[in-house]
């Protein structure tokens, strides 16, 4: 749809008293594909940081420091891979390679500053964006028992605290507004949307969604 048409439809929905939210794996500062659309709130970083509007934070959950120590030890002793460390105000990456640059171009994502991996333990980290393959995932995640991976791209996965996902963020938003789960509808297309599609009153998979998501959705 044309951006003006999207905005008009969204305004019509909100004028009817329906609240509209974004649930994303991205940091609020790098959400760059919404144009001038306005939302009632944002579930960002796969549920780790939730906003009312763009300014009021109502929920935060960070990766345990011990998990970051485990990650550093794994990279020092076994194998290295690029990893973006997402903090409240900024993010950094331990190093770049061909895959990271490809993803940054594909997603129009600003290339993070490069810092030593030990910087990760000096300030709270909400989420990791880890550039390892599906074949590497099992062995790497075994070294991070405090975390779980939510993959929506073959080149990288989001890593969040165990039990952290978009549905947790949705629950925080619903509690804030006093909305029941049965009154909700969620749309998604990626693997990290599965929890919120399952949890919503009505879960809808987009036509381009992966098969796992389509199988648990109420509608496609």
Feature names for model-found ranges:
Residues 21, 43, 185-187, 204:
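Hydrophobic/aromatic beta-strand patches that form the interior of the parallel beta-sheet core
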Residues 199, 204-220:
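Asp-based, Mg2+/Mn2+-dependent phosphohydrolase catalytic module
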Residues 1-9:
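Single conserved hydrophobic/aromatic residue that forms the stacking wall/gate
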Residues 10-34, 46, 86, 126-131, ...:
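Substrate-recognition element of Asp-dependent hydrolases with the DxDx(T/V) motif
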Residues 26-43, 133-148:
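Substrate-recognition/cap helix-loop segment adjacent to the acidic, metal-dependent catalytic center
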